[in-house]
Amino acid sequence: MSHQERIASQRRTTAEVPMHRSTANQSKRSRSPFASTRRRWDDSESSGASLAVESEDYSRYPPREYRASGSRRGLAYGHIDTVVARDSEEEGAGPVDRLPVRGKAGKFKDDPEKGARSSRFTSVNHDAKEECGKVESPPAARCSARRAELSKQNGSSASQISSAEGRAAAKGNNSLERERQNLPARPSRAPVSICGGGENTPKSAEEPVVRPKVRNVATPNCMKPKVFFDTDDDDDVPHSTSRWRDAADAEEAHAEGLARRGRGEAASSSEPRYAEDQDARSEQAKADKVPRRRRTMADPDFWAYTDDYYRYYEEDSDSDKEWMAALRRKYRSREQPQSSSGESWELLPGKEELERQQAGAGSLASAGSNGSGYPEEVQDPSLQEEEQASLEEGEIPWLRYNENESSSEGDNESTHELIQPGMFMLDGNNNLEDDSSVSEDLEVDWSLFDGFADGLGVAEAISYVDPQFLTYMALEERLAQAMETALAHLESLAVDVEVANPPASKESIDALPEILVTEDHGAVGQEMCCPICCSEYVKGEVATELPCHHYFHKPCVSIWLQKSGTCPVCRCMFPPPL
């Protein structure tokens, strides 16, 4: 059987097989300007059914007068079989009335009533086709219709028909593969979900027939229309998404405006509707910015940049970061010469005086903010002369600043005052004494400052050295000397027990001479006191003399010699060795 005979048999078969369509009981709202009335199987009419192929939802390019009428676009509801009907007609596969319901593998469902209903359905679809002709067809449809007209005018031979049917069959197979992947065969304006219904019959052994496009009709119970926005990426329809895009931009701007107003930074990209609303907004913005301006009062030129701030504030930018970054760059570039001019060596004023100067500079800057230049901080020459006159002769400004700083810290730095130079000193016995008790005979080791002075004077050397460091150096020197003396004394007292001299015998102790202290002798052996008990010799006491010619009280030296047979002063052995 040739390809043309197969096509002819297909047309005869599809003409005899009645159409089984599930009627959609629910009505969909159609935005099409054409009538969407169709006939049901029981000779009744219903409006808004899914067979309205001229609906605006299924037309890729509706008339321009309808597009400009103001109706909103972007929603699509309907069955996919209507799109198949148009596609099959545009591609030259045959009239619309040849759309049977396909089962599982190519079997068609039969109906005892064949003729009348099929003819009524064909007439209804032909009416729809005539109305659809009035609508502006898509480019692909126009091209296919133009090709069909040219083929009719030229007399369309059988070979051309067979090639057209082959292309239609190939497109049908591609559409079936896309359908399995949930993709529409032709990307339309509003794709809808495809779901099959009805029972499928097993495949028979009959001869297969080439069918260009056959799809399952979606039943009403499984029909789930999806909502899509119109993308409209073509150049000839530039304003198809303008309405919903404008609405989305308006809502986003409104939400951003509320958020910015909540933090005191509302972007006024559009003017408010009412003047009182604008005044209230400006008052609210001013009230929100009061604490921020108070925090930046340390910067005297803050008010000088308010005009730049509000100029960037009124601009319609994509984000807040752009104008904030630009404002910071502008502010820093104009702040650099001021910071460089303030790096000179000068006296630092007190806190109250600094606040007064900042307040005065801020008022001057705000008064001259309308001009192009910004006033710089210039100290009054009269104030400089007064400050120089207040300095004592030979006083160093750095020392005066340190004094002010230490006095402003108050009692929190009381320990700093306790370790000033000369506050503590060591006496001759390496003991710490208060400076107030020996202020008249204060001795300072000025040799410690020889390395720092270098001929410039001690006062200038002290000004460049931390007083705490100098005090620590002096104290460390005294402590080192005292430690050396103590170690030497301990070494002298360290006596090995094994080599210690044994105690003197009782006979040798009793053999010591006794010297009676009289009034005539005020001193015994030119000594006024006993080295052991450190008490003066008194009239009537008994003293004694060791072979080394050291004098002691007789009872004191007797006790000492009973423990160690040596002189307590010179460590000479007693009794002396023979």
UniProtKB/Swiss-Prot annotation:
Q: List where Acidic residues composition bias occurs.
A: 377-395
GO molecular-function annotation terms? ubiquitin protein ligase activity; zinc ion binding
Q: What class of enzyme is it?
A: transferase
Which is a Gene Ontology cellular component entry for this protein? cytoplasm
Record PTM Phosphoserine, positions in chain: 317, 319
Q: Respond yes or no to whether keyword Ubl conjugation is given for this record.
A: yes
Look up the signal peptide feature and give its range: none
The UniProt PTM text for this protein says: Substrate for E2-dependent ubiquitination.
Under catalytic activity, the entry for this protein gives: S-ubiquitinyl-[E2 ubiquitin-conjugating enzyme]-L-cysteine + [acceptor protein]-L-lysine = [E2 ubiquitin-conjugating enzyme]-L-cysteine + N(6)-ubiquitinyl-[acceptor protein]-L-lysine
Q: Keyword set for this entry?
A: Metal-binding, Phosphoprotein, Transferase, Ubl conjugation, Ubl conjugation pathway, Zinc, Zinc-finger
Modified residue annotations for Phosphothreonine: 231
Q: What is the effect of changing residue 533 to A?
A: No effect on MAGED1 binding. Decrease in ubiquitination of MAGED1. No inhibition of DLX5-dependent transcriptional activity
SUPFAM superfamilies tied to this protein:
RING/U-box
Q: What induces it?
A: By fear memory. Differential induction of isoforms.
A Pfam family:
zf-RING_2
The name under which this protein is listed is: E3 ubiquitin-protein ligase Praja-1
